[in-house]
């Protein structure tokens, strides 16, 4: 059921002003090949692509598009979706940009960021301005508007830690809504927007960031050690958020392939959460197993460690293989050395091969992280 929230007056006014001279045809590419619009570089032919350059275009565009029978599908940066060969849908591609300071004092700053802004560029912008909290999320691909859907996270930080509010358009009812953080129902790699996939177009995301350069989160992996070496190279004895950001960028660049060079959609599997008792049993058999206590009863296990330990790094079913340096990432080799683009079926073959292998060896079920889209633009949890 859709939560009930008040319409944003400023957004509604902007939309109404655009109605009189709105020309939908200027925004449409038809038919549209989406190969360049998804980081896995899967060939996907859609009915049409509607590029929304201004927030004021959202309401009139959707009103006109819904006069037809074809479903609507929101495609942001395309970094977390597995697309079909044919997509019988009208694809909405929001690219509007802008960053506004809503409030600021000596301790913090509140921002509102348009959904078309590049996520990593936002992280760089905030840290370089002395606004901290997003630095651990550096180099995550995609756009700001898609970040809440998956509640993106990395190196001990999740988006929800800094998020304050969201403005979004509900496609089924064609109404604007404001969400506080609590309304978003965030969980590990999950949110209301993911649970109600395909129903929302997020246009603005609000953040509250701090200005305390001594407050860092560097307890994850090798971040602290590398961040300290960066600080010392700059003649500083204590690490700051900028050191954490650059350390994470260095780590990610050393382990993760650039989607522009070797197509991928980032971490393909979620880190599974298992019972602490099961983890203790596995730890007895595999002393090097990597896990992080969630609570007294549950431990989160590093999926990459499981895949690597199972001997699956660099393995899979051509042309989709796990990356040679980071087993958690599936890469599409067909984009480099084949005239035949990879398909959903190719990805599914490698996905299920890895899932079976991990289940057989460790008794753990791996869950896919990117969302699966069928030809009718429906998001599916399976296969």
Curated annotation (Swiss-Prot):
Pathway stated in the Swiss-Prot or TrEMBL entry: Cell wall biogenesis; peptidoglycan biosynthesis
Recorded catalytic activity of this chain's protein: UDP-N-acetyl-alpha-D-muramate + NADP(+) = UDP-N-acetyl-3-O-(1-carboxyvinyl)-alpha-D-glucosamine + NADPH + H(+)
GO CC, alphabetical: cytosol
Active site (UniProt): 189, 267 (proton donor), 369
Segments forming domain FAD-binding PCMH-type: 42-212
Keyword flag Protein transport: no
Cofactor(s) the record lists: FAD
Major subcellular site: cytoplasm
Enzyme Commission (EC) number: 1.3.1.98
SUPFAM superfamilies in the cross-refs: FAD-binding/transporter-associated domain-like (SSF56176), Uridine diphospho-N-Acetylenolpyruvylglucosamine reductase, MurB, C-terminal domain (SSF56194)
Protein name per its UniProtKB record: UDP-N-acetylenolpyruvoylglucosamine reductase
Organism field: Psychrobacter sp. (strain PRwf-1)
Gene (name only): murB
